[in-house]
Amino acid sequence: MALTDLTIHELQALLKNREISSRELTQAFLTRIADTDQRIGAFITQSEEAALKNAEAADARLAAGNAASLTGIPLALKDIFITEGMRTTCASRILDNFVPPYSGTAVRKLQEQDAVILGKLNMDEFAMGSSNENSAFGTVKNPWNQDCVPGGSSGGSAACVAARQAVATLGTDTGGSIRQPASHCGVVGLKPTYGRVSRYGVIAYASSLDQVGPLTRDVEDCALMLGAVAGYDPADSTSINTPVPDYQAALKQGIQGLKIGLPKEYFIEGLDTDIRQTIDKAIATLRKLGAEPVEVSLPHTEYAVACYYLIATAEASSNLARYDGVRYGERVDQGRGLIDMYMQSRAAGFGPEVKRRIMLGTYALSSGYYDAYYLKAQKVRTLIRQDFLDAFNQVDVILTPVAPTPAFRMGEKTADPLQMYLSDIFTIPVNLAGTCGMSVPCGFSHDGLPIGLQLIGRPFGEETILRTAYAYEQATDWHRHCAPL
């Protein structure tokens, strides 16, 4: 088995025992990127020289016997994370030349453990998209079928792991942007509870919804990565000051007697046949492992997409007001005055989907429509959160599909934004509720595309969904399948 096929927990032992060096491991991944990324397009910026230098520093720490859990492990980051000295674009022309003077908290935590950062990954521009077709740096291709999308907005993060270009990656999830691409690319992806991981140093899309999370080969790596980045951060006012559990220790507790909720609103007519059959088989497997499936109701699910696209776009219109060509980013200097320069810089710098969402959000916040749209959406959000809290009075975990279909073909939905928005119908409610959810590989469609199982936990219930996912993963081998690159 190639080094690039191994997980973090497998590589830890090899590094600790000095059977391999971090430099050797890092070079193997850099070679893999060189061999595959012309076909996939997962990377926006590679950091080969710095990665090899950091790998040598990690080797010194390993030799001294004081390694941390990620020392010497090659990782990659969605290009939404601020990284000191490394270009950060958010897949937008307007930030094409932006090199930040500092690193965000999640990145710094990885660096403090001597993880090796290979580079920055492609995404939908400003995390706005469900297919990774909205990047100024080209479309990412699904490693399982390069005619299909990898999902979005963390499409590069999922494709990178599936293509064995890094051991694991960090992404962000605002309405499904970790879980949906994880499902489409056949990897594990977890969106933590809002406030569990610091957002400091993450370029904001929708501040009340954005959350940082890992994408990995298997559940154990996911638990390890979450533990590495989770925790209170005084630099983020939304960070929650609660202890971080030992997520790895919780994995092997089993799921005997665990009640798993099946929301009737998610298992409806029109759900793709392959998705339905695969999810039904996963439910049967969990039942054999001792879990008890229970039907529950999340009655306000049907309003989630409309609610999300009012709240998220309203927050985006405010967050993206800072990109004016003056303080950082691209500037168009042909304007006839300051206001004209603002307008031309933003017109040239933002892509069409970002412009669409800024306009939607500005409209929702306008004085004549604030109460009718934005305020009403916030009230619906409260109802959706209460639906989940009520359901968790009956069950320990909620199980649903991640997406209504497997990965779709490139260009299939670009002409119909509403159809694209509906791709996230099963993931958006988790963000609105502020709770945690993850995608675990659970099978393939009839044409060989991966399918993910979504496990949703109560707020700060990451331990429970991780041990449920681990029990399922140990009973199956879906996570061992490799994309045919």
UniProtKB/Swiss-Prot annotation:
Residues of the active site: K78, S153, S177
EC number(s) recorded for this UniProt protein: 6.3.5.7
GO BP annotation list: translation
A cellular component term, taken from the record's GO annotations: glutamyl-tRNA(Gln) amidotransferase complex
Gene3D superfamilies: Amidase signature (AS) domain (3.90.1300.10)
Reaction catalysed by this enzyme: L-glutamyl-tRNA(Gln) + L-glutamine + ATP + H2O = L-glutaminyl-tRNA(Gln) + L-glutamate + ADP + phosphate + H(+)
Keyword Nucleotide-binding recorded: yes
Keyword field: ATP-binding, Ligase, Nucleotide-binding, Protein biosynthesis
Origin superkingdom: Bacteria
Pfam families in the record: Amidase (PF01425)
Enzyme class: ligase
Molecular function GO terms recorded: ATP binding; glutaminyl-tRNA synthase (glutamine-hydrolyzing) activity
UniProt entry tagged with the keyword Magnesium: no
NCBIfam families: gatA
HAMAP family: GatA (MF_00120)
Role according to the record: Allows the formation of correctly charged Gln-tRNA(Gln) through the transamidation of misacylated Glu-tRNA(Gln) in organisms which lack glutaminyl-tRNA synthetase. The reaction takes place in the presence of glutamine and ATP through an activated gamma-phospho-Glu-tRNA(Gln).
Family of the protein in this entry: Belongs to the amidase family. GatA subfamily.
Quaternary organization: Heterotrimer of A, B and C subunits.
Protein name stated in the entry: Glutamyl-tRNA(Gln) amidotransferase subunit A
Organism: Syntrophotalea carbinolica (strain DSM 2380 / NBRC 103641 / GraBd1) (Pelobacter carbinolicus)
